[in-house]
């Protein structure tokens, strides 16, 4: 299945129940690869996608959230923000652009580094939602979990240089929720 971007956006809903059908590796690989094509500040690529299929890890994610879809989905994506100053910019950007970007990151305190990394991680998460929909998969983006428990579940316990952007349950839908509706317009031109 392949949808246009507009179709994937229009059809995407939060789905919390899934069939038992496993997600083929090639489809999951495409979703993750497309998610990681998301733009990031300075192209610093300060987000990782942890692909969770192991039931024990999914059980730990459920314990961190009490959200059954994280336990029951065939796969869960944990979008992790690299909340420290990047060290690989010369390899990613070349020396001149890396020097400029490093100057920016050097001016940030720990809270600002975390905030900018989380913004990048949320871009990756949004791309993952649309990429999954385009492949015929349903998703449930979640918040409301204990971040330290999520980090522990994916092997990053005690790391203050990592943060969780979003935890996304994913699988083939066992339900088709109706469109929940939207306000007539949230668009604001120029200023409030």
List the predicted regions and their residue ranges.
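Acidic, surface-exposed loops and disordered segments
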Residues: 1-192
């Amino acid at each position: 299945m392949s949808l246009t971007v507009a179709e994937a956006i229009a059809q995407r809903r939060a789905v919390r129940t899934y069939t038992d059908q496993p997600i083929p590796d090639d489809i999951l690989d495409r979703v993750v690869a497309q998610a990681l094509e998301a733009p990031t500040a300075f192209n610093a690529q300060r987000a990782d996608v942890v692909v969770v299929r192991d039931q024990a890890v999914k059980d730990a994610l459920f314990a961190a959230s009490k959200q059954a879809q994280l336990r029951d989905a065939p796969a869960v994506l944990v979008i992790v923000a690299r909340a420290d100053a990047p060290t690989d910019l010369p390899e990613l950007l070349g020396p001149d652009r890396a020097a400029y970007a490093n100057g920016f990151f050097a001016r940030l305190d720990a809270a600002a580094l975390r905030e900018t990394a989380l913004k990048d991680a949320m871009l990756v998460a949004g791309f993952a939602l649309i990429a999954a929909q385009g492949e015929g998969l349903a998703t449930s983006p979640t918040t409301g979990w204990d971040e330290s428990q999520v980090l522990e579940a994916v092997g990053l316990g005690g790391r203050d240089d990592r943060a969780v952007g979003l935890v996304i349950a994913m699988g083939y839908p066992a339900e088709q929720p109706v469109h929940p509706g939207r306000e007539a317009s949230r668009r604001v031109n120029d200023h409030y």
